[in-house]
A protein has these predicted regions:
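Catalytic core of soluble alpha/beta enzymes
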Residues: 83-236, 240-264
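N-terminal capping/lid subdomain adjacent to the active-site entrance of alpha/beta enzymes
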Residues: 1-125
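Expand to "…catalyze enediolate/carbanion chemistry for C-C bond making/breaking, isomerization
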Residues: 272
């Protein structure tokens, strides 16, 4: 990119025959365990997608009857309605549950899991809901099959929730396997697990080709530079959303990803 006096996203777009996005990619902010205080930060900043929530324990975060997460979704909805500056602000509620719904109801009890997802979707209204990692089947083939069957149950019943595949969907090969089988409505594309950055680009483009949502994720443990490079890939491939990273404090990850995206748009706009 430097040798050609071009932006990284422009080099990636040329390589894959795409067009760099002329608008911001929705940014997904993650709260860590400060899921209440950080949710307020996200709402006040106008986060596109929030709050992640780190729902990784049945007893303390999901509840033995799913009541704790249900209460949190209701609180989050009410908080957005109270704090939003404009009524047009309609963020997506995206919660990562780390397989805890499957632990509670049983990985293969798809009707029971769908019943619970329906309650969550109702509590989230009027906001759209995404649930990441509803179950963890302990191996790739079973995970793919369980995600596909739960998605089919959700779609059959018309439940307004998107399922996001995470566990066991790590490499480019895994992404293609899950996308081919429609094992979820959206796949998280994890930058660290994919090796070279070209694999991230190809995974996003493959999901788009298959009609599957492409969430360009990663980890809170990346560097600021890796996050900036990921922004260029997301803009070149037009991912559906990108994770604010690194860190779990909301401000730092959002600042790095948001500013890099704005820089791309400003520099390209100046040339137009």
């Amino acid at each position: 990119a430097h040798s050609k006096h071009r932006l990284m996203c422009e080099v990636v777009a040329e390589e894959y025959g795409t067009a760099v996005s002329d608008r911001m990619i929705p940014i997904f902010m993650q709260s860590g365990d400060s899921r209440y205080d950080n949710a307020d930060k996200m709402i006040l900043k106008g986060a596109d997608v929030l709050p992640h929530g780190l729902i990784n324990n049945v007893d303390t975060k999901l509840g033995r009857h799913g009541e704790k997460l249900l209460d949190y979704v209701g609180w989050l909805r009410d908080r957005i309605l109270k704090l939003r500056v404009m009524e047009t602000y309609q963020p997506v509620l995206h919660l990562d549950v780390y397989g805890t719904i499957g632990i509670l109801f049983g990985n293969e009890h798809f009707a029971a899991m769908a019943d619970y997802l329906e309650k969550l979707a109702e509590a989230a209204k009027p906001f759209h809901l995404r649930i990441e990692g509803p179950m963890d089947a302990d191996e790739r083939e079973r995970q793919m099959a369980d995600m596909r069957l739960l998605r089919e149950e959700v779609d059959r019943r018309g439940i307004p929730v998107e399922l996001v595949a995470d566990e066991w969907c790590n490499t480019l090969e895994d992404v293609k396997y899950f996308a081919d089988n429609k094992a979820g409505h959206m796949l998280q594309i994890k930058t660290p697990d994919l090796g070279g950055i070209q694999n991230t680009a190809e995974a996003v483009l493959y999901c788009r080709e298959k009609g599957i949502g492409a969430y360009q994720g990663g980890t809170c443990n990346e560097t600021d530079r890796s996050a900036q490079v990921c922004v260029h890939v997301a803009m070149a491939t037009r991912a559906d959303q990108i994770l604010a990273k690194p860190g779990m404090g909301v401000d730092e990850g959002h600042m790095i990803v948001y500013n890099e995206m704005r820089r791309i748009l400003a520099l390209r706009g100046r040339r137009a």
